């Protein structure tokens, strides 16, 4: 039985108020107890005690949406004007510069290293190369959810899919988007998840073009992208918004869904999100990079299932969750007010866990949860410890662990 005691000046449980000059007792990779250091030392004799000192101990970041497998593609991305232009670049790169399996694996491994060095302990990764990228993810020591990306070409095989799951690794389905998956494909994914009690993810409401597509209006997906892919148009129910489209087709019924981006969502749709218990994952820097707008963060402040993701380096500058958090904070501070720092840190931890439906395992410092923790030693301390986290950078990460096992520690 492995036992550890971590002491810190500040502990941010996320699920409760900050705790000062206390400790977290770990047993077999789980959080067992939080309390005063002296009391825990007396209670647990001969425990390995690591006094971290001045700094903040908090749950590891949950990067709730990435495309590590596309790391190789950055050398083909130059200037572009619109989201559609960017999609054309991605299609061209995949067609004319198809990556080798080694390139894909190297992209994933490089991404994993970047994630670990910037405080991520759980990653939700999209797998779009028929599983080539899964092996490095199984062995990376991060807590990993791999979403197998589904397009119409996979439709006939959905029933046969077998999803793997172990302590640190889990597979789920990810129909790409309403404009790239026909209603028939989405229906098959929904039925599969309903039958097998699985959740799925989807890119949803990312761009205005998607809203035009859903409304059966002229759009650049059908006009410009389908011809490049040799894809035929498909009939669909008309809806005013992507969220309404999913509701009309009953694709949320009885299943848990993690919806990524959710930029073009209307105020009245907040109630729909709550009623259907949808997990919302925001990628604000990616949205800015791709010029699709910014999510209605003030609306989402009311949600518990609200997470943050960096997306991939194909649509962002890096995979750094510290930078994602600070961008999120600075972008919406004026709109949301003084609670923005706490909201940003929540979305990067417990909110992300809830958006991925893994809050029973990770996301906060509570007894029974996995010891997926990070410790930062900020240069600048604010009165508000959440603001201190927001102001921190990856260079101030002093410790990262998953299941109580150290992943990163520059001092060791």
Question: What would you call each of these model-derived segments?
Answer:
Residues 370-412:
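C-terminal cap of metal-dependent C-N hydrolases
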Residues 132-139, 158-279, 291-306, 360:
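Histidine/acidic residue-rich metal-binding segments in metalloenzymes
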Residues 1-43, 358, 405:
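N-terminal metal-binding scaffold of metallo-dependent hydrolase/deaminase domains
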Residues 67, 128-129, 147-153, 176-178, ...:
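Active-site beta-loop-alpha junctions enriched in small/polar residues
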Residues 56-57, 74-140, 161-166:
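Alpha-helical scaffold segments that flank or form the walls of functional sites
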Residues 72-105, 145, 208-254, 328-336:
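Active-site gating loops and adjacent loop-to-helix segments of metal-dependent hydrolytic enzymes
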Residues 248-252, 282, 295-379, 392:
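His/Asp/Glu-enriched, well-ordered alpha-helical/loop segment
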């Amino acid at each position: 039985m492995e036992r550890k005691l971590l002491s810190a000046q500040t502990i941010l449980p996320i699920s409760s108020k900050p705790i000062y000059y206390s400790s977290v007792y770990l047993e077999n990779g789980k959080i067992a107890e939080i309390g005063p250091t002296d009391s825990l030392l007396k209670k647990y004799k001969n425990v390995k005690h690591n006094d971290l000192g001045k700094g903040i101990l908090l749950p590891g970041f949950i990067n709730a949406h990435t495309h590590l497998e596309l790391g190789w593609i950055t050398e083909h991305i130059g200037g572009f004007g619109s989201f559609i232009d960017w999609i054309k670049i991605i299609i061209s790169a995949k067609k004319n510069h198809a990556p080798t399996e080694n390139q894909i694996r190297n992209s994933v491994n490089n991404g994993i290293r970047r994630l670990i060095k910037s405080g991520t302990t759980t990653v939700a990764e999209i797998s779009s190369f028929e599983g080539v990228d899964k092996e490095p993810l199984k062995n990376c020591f991060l807590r990993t959810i791999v979403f197998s990306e589904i397009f119409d070409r996979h439709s006939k095989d959905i029933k046969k899919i077998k999803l793997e799951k172990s302590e640190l690794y889990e597979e789920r389905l990810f129909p790409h988007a309403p404009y790239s998956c026909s209603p028939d494909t989405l229906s098959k994914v929904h039925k599969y998840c309903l039958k097998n009690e699985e959740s799925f993810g989807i890119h949803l409401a990312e761009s205005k073009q998607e809203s035009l597509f859903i409304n059966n209006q002229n759009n650049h997906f059908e006009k410009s992208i389908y011809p490049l892919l040799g894809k035929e148009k498909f009939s669909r129910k008309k809806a005013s918004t992507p969220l309404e489209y999913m509701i009309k087709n009953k694709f949320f019924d009885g299943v848990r869904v993690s919806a990524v981006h959710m930029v073009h969502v209307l105020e009245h749709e907040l109630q729909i999100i709550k009623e259907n218990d949808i997990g919302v994952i925001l990628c604000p820097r990616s949205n800015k990079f791709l010029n699709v707008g910014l999510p209605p963060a003030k609306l989402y402040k009311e949600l518990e299932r609200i997470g943050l993701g960096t997306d991939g380096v194909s649509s962002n500058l890096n995979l750094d969750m510290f930078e994602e958090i600070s961008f999120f904070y600075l972008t919406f501070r004026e709109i949301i007010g003084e609670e923005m720092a706490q909201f940003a840190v929540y979305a990067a931890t417990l909110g992300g866990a809830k958006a991925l439906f893994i809050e029973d395992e990770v996301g906060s410092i509570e007894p029974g949860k996995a010891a997926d923790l990070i410790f930062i030693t900020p240069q600048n301390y604010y009165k508000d410890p959440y603001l201190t986290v927001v102001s921190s950078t990856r260079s101030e990460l002093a410790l990262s662990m998953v299941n109580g096992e150290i992943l990163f520690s520059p001092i060791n």
